[in-house]
């Protein structure tokens, strides 16, 4: 990732050097906190939005696009000013529905870092209908601004007029708001407990079927993923995708995976088979499944 980032940001530019130094200090995680953002803006006389626009090619460099070879970068800006990178993630030799779109990537990245509200979405290409619908599920969606290289300060609902969303199904819960499904993490295996805790934070008001993923890497690091459901159903993002996306955006190598656990309360639906199908194309490590 280090060399790819350096190729994306030519190092004969002082701003690019400063950005690379920040990323190097955090092992190439695609994230800048508010203090880092403000320091860069101050040192190089940039607005927050101009810095985000400058970072879009960098965000796109985290893409995996074996199918389309079309890299999309996104930056979700949290309500406190943190920058969460996102990029489209494609999975060859699996169903195209397994894909993670860049806006989904940035939002789920923010969610797994416990962000509660997105104020702005900055992206290098106009959001597709799938992503517009996904963003409409967010806590505070009515206040989100969309920024493109050719057009800034656009309300999300200008891209999705007469929108269908949670309110049409009498659902008050929104993605990024605090969730609790009263799942108890009392297993003797800590990795199973982490998958249960992730499931407990799922957003699944339509199926009430939470599931979570916990991935153990060979160095002892653990990445978890939660299920993000959508009022329109198809734009929903399974927990395996949110976990893999977080791994990609934080420079984890899938070849270093040691164990993968899924914990699921499958009341109306199950993601077990879908997860196993995708994993079979990525790793020889088998899914460990725990029914809740």
From Swiss-Prot:
Keywords: Hydrolase, Metal-binding, Zinc. Zn(2+) binds at residues 101, 128, 131. GO terms for molecular function: cytidine deaminase activity; identical protein binding; zinc ion binding. It catalyses: cytidine + H2O + H(+) = uridine + NH4(+); 2'-deoxycytidine + H2O + H(+) = 2'-deoxyuridine + NH4(+). Its cofactor is Zn(2+). Binds 1 zinc ion. This is Cytidine deaminase. PANTHER family: CYTIDINE DEAMINASE. Substrate binds at residues 88-90. PROSITE patterns: CYT_DCMP_DEAMINASES_1 (PS00903), CYT_DCMP_DEAMINASES_2 (PS51747). NCBIfam families: cyt_deam_dimer, PRK09027.1. It comes from the Bacteria. It comes from Haemophilus influenzae (strain PittGG). Gene3D superfamilies: Cytidine Deaminase, domain 2. GO terms for biological process: cytidine deamination. SUPFAM superfamilies: Cytidine deaminase-like (SSF53927). GO terms for cellular component: cytosol.
């Amino acid at each position: 990732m280090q060399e790819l980032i350096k190729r994306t940001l030519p190092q004969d530019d002082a701003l690019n050097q400063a950005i690379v130094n920040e990323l190097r200090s955090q092992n190439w995680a695609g994230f800048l906190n508010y203090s880092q953002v403000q320091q860069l803006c101050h040192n190089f006389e940039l607005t927050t939005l101009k810095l985000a626009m400058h970072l879009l090619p960098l965000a796109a460099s985290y893409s995996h696009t074996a199918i389309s070879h079309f890299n999309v970068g996104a930056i979700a800006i949290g309500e406190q000013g943190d920058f969460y990178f996102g990029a489209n993630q494609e999975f060859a030799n699996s169903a195209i529905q397994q894909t993670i779109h860049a806006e989904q990537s940035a939002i789920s990245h923010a969610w797994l870092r416990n962000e509660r509200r997105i104020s702005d979405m900055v992206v290098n290409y106009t959001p597709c209908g799938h992503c517009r619908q996904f963003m409409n599920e967010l806590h505070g969606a009515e206040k989100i601004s969309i920024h493109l290289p050719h057009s800034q300060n656009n309300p999300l609902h200008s891209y999705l007029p007469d929108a269908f969303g949670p309110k049409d199904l009498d659902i008050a819960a929104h993605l990024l708001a605090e969730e609790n499904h009263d799942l108890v993490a009392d297993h003797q295996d800590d990795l199973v407990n982490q998958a249960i805790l992730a499931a407990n934070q799922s957003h699944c008001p339509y199926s009430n079927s939470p599931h979570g993923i916990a991935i153990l890497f060979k160095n002892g690091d653990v990445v978890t993923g939660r299920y993000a459901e959508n009022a329109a159903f198809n734009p929903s993002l399974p927990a395996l995708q949110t976990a893999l996306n977080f791994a990609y955006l934080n420079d984890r190598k899938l070849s270093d995976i040691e164990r993968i656990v899924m914990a699921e309360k499958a009341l109306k639906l199950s993601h077990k088979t879908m997860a196993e199908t995708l994993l079979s194309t990525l790793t020889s490590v088998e899914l460990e499944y725990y029914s809740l």
